[in-house]
């Protein structure tokens, strides 16, 4: 007999989420996740993927992944610390370090795993972490797992960060203090004030950690937010994903050799999870090589991002203060944002609504993610649909 308590808990809470318009229905994409997708037989302009550079469907990467399956199999077969470390993993990590301008790098199974692994391996109950109030959920969970004292500072507020860093240092309570931030904030598209953060870190001897999941492949000519500001020798820990702009799956942390040596023996997701698959490893390596060889895809991404932003702004939509191709249309009311997303879907645009608690209450939005793979015709069609629905709903 199964638990009646569990059944009651699930029924009550799922019903509550649905009543408040906060239950997320998951759509199934039929086929590849490209600039256009098909859901339940309906063709849609896709403005919701993280496939920034269109590499998830890149033909060269697909072919090299197939060859890796033939030569190395479909899986690594073990955790990295037993005999799951393949030559392909070492080659990938060397390429990541070269890409990020660091001594070494370590690859994980996902970006979320990176933050769970690296933060808790370096910080403990005798330490403190200064964390931006809008940091990603994986950072929040990684900080909690470390058992360090979590001190939130107001989003990108350098005065608040400096004051809280000063108080933490002067308290004498902590062995180590880390400051951690997203490089690019995924809900609003703004970029962290890394030069000022680094200055504060140097003033108070803080460990610097940048989660560049949405910056790698996008900012710094593709090399990320740390490179964008020329701070490769000033940031202790650079985290990034092999999904999003790279188009595959996995994540990494890059930094000094001593840091990577420590993570290999103390980060639990590395120690207790089977390694990244051979196909994913070689496809990720090739994607990074492509970014290092040419800025063409990166330039196309920014061109399309600027084009969509300008089109939506001219219509009168509130697109916030985004500094990257991420383009929110901030509606405000949560239910209205969800209705707007639904109407866009009906007219041929897939742009998911983002509501509380993912964003602050009263800032419900539809988040647009243009990619290098979109054509101008696709973006023009999307803008026209935005205009039609926006006027119908009296949003513009």
From Swiss-Prot:
Molecular functions per Gene Ontology: pyridoxal phosphate binding; transferase activity
Q: What class of enzyme is it?
A: transferase
Cofactor(s) needed, names only, are: pyridoxal 5'-phosphate
Q: Which UniProt keywords apply?
A: Pyridoxal phosphate, Transferase
UniProt-annotated binding residues for substrate: 136, 358
Q: Which GO terms fall under biological process for this protein?
A: biosynthetic process
Where in the chain are disulfide-linked cysteines found? none
Q: Which InterPro entries match?
A: Aminotrans_II_pyridoxalP_BS, Aminotransferase_I/II_large, AON_synthase_class-II, AONS_Archaea/Firmicutes, PyrdxlP-dep_Trfase, PyrdxlP-dep_Trfase_major, PyrdxlP-dep_Trfase_small
Q: Which residues carry this modification: N6-(pyridoxal phosphate)lysine?
A: 244
**What's its EC?**
2.3.1.-
Record-listed pyridoxal 5'-phosphate binding positions: 111-112, 186, 211-214, 241-244
Assembly behavior: Homodimer.
Family per similarity comment: Belongs to the class-II pyridoxal-phosphate-dependent aminotransferase family.
Which NCBIfam families does the UniProt entry name for this protein?
Answer: gly_Cac_T_rel, PRK06939.1
Q: What name does this protein carry?
A: Putative pyridoxal phosphate-dependent acyltransferase
Question: Per the UniProt entry, what species is this protein from, by scientific name?
Answer: Oceanobacillus iheyensis (strain DSM 14371 / CIP 107618 / JCM 11309 / KCTC 3954 / HTE831)
């Amino acid at each position: 007999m199964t638990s009646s308590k569990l059944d009651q808990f699930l029924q009550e809470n799922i019903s509550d989420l649905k009543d408040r318009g906060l239950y997320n229905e998951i759509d199934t994409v039929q086929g590849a996740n490209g600039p256009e997708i098909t859901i339940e037989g309906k063709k849609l302009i896709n403005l919701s993927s993280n496939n920034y550079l269109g590499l998830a469907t890149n033909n060269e990467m697909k072919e090299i992944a197939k060859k890796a399956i033939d030569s190395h199999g479909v899986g690594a077969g073990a955790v990295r610390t037993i005999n799951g470390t393949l030559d392909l993993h070492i080659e990938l990590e060397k390429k990541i370090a070269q890409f990020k301008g660091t001594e070494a790098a370590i690859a994980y199974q996902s970006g979320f795993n990176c933050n769970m692994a690296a933060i808790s391996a370096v910080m403990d109950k005798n330490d403190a972490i200064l964390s931006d109030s809008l940091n990603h959920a994986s950072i929040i969970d990684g900080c909690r797992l470390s058992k360090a004292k979590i001190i939130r500072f107001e989003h990108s507020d350098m005065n608040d960060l400096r004051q809280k860093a000063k108080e933490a240092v002067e308290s004498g309570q902590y062995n180590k203090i880390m400051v951690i931030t997203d490089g690019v904030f995924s809900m609003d598209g703004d970029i962290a004030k890394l030069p000022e953060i680094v200055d504060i870190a140097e003033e108070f001897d803080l460990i610097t950690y940048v989660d560049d999941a949405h910056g790698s492949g996008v900012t710094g000519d593709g090399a990320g937010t740390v490179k964008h500001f020329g701070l490769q020798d000033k940031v202790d820990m650079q985290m990034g994903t092999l999904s999003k702009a790279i188009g595959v799956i996995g994540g990494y942390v890059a930094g000094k050799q001593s840091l990577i040596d420590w993570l290999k023996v103390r980060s639990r997701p590395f120690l207790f999870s089977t390694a990244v698959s051979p196909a994913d490893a070689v496809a990720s390596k090739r994607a990074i090589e492509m970014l290092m060889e040419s800025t063409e895809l990166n330039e196309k991404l920014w061109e399309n991002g600027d084009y969509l932003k300008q089109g939506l702004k001219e219509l009168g939509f509130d697109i916030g203060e985004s500094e990257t191709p991420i383009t929110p249309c901030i509606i405000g009311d949560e239910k209205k944002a969800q209705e707007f997303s639904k109407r866009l879907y009906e007219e041929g645009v897939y742009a998911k609504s983002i509501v509380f608690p993912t964003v602050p209450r009263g800032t419900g939005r539809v988040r647009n993610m243009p990619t290098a793979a979109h054509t101008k015709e696709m973006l023009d069609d999307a803008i026209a649909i935005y205009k039609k629905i926006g006027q119908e709903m009296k949003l513009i």
